């Protein structure tokens, strides 16, 4: 199967590898350069063009579900991506961050396999895994909580456990929600996001140890900002 055919099927990992962000991935050692070199960059007439999930008209993986782990689950990846996913696991091992590896590759992936029976949204699933809050609670109870972590797009109006979550936010006011201004440069926010996204929009933050901050921020950027201008890459 050619690269073109793979990309046309919206394989999420191939899309990342073939995007301008692949150089950033190599810089952060999440993908080896020799692997990234096998995939051509997408050429875009507008280098500043990007899109923010969810995307209307796309399938389940790109539309309503808030968990970035949908994009990492090898259940939905084609064989070429599964091999890349295996190598990505190796790269995470090399980062010597066992907590973040376990969190990404085991906890919510288990939730994903149990809760998503197909690519079609169901009325009972809404936009929240049943295990998400429990896992997040376990994470926040760790004594070494800091400002590092993983960003997940979140829509409060869609949460089916709102009361529980609001009490959760009250307990951790600084670690539950953080404004976009705190993670994106203000010039970029004003020039690129102002017409698309209100400044006050919120993104759910899964805190981790301080040493994971770069990894968490990179994951947020990869899955929620597509084709981000190189000038604003961290």
From Swiss-Prot:
Primary location recorded for the protein, binned into one broad class: cytoplasm
Domain of life: Eukaryota
Primary gene name: rgg8
Subcellular localization(s) per the UniProt record: Cytoplasm; Nucleus
Protein name: Protein rgg8
One GO biological process term: mitochondrial tRNA 5'-end processing
SS bonds (residue pairs): none
Keywords from the UniProt entry: Cytoplasm, Nucleus
GO cellular component: mitochondrion; nucleus
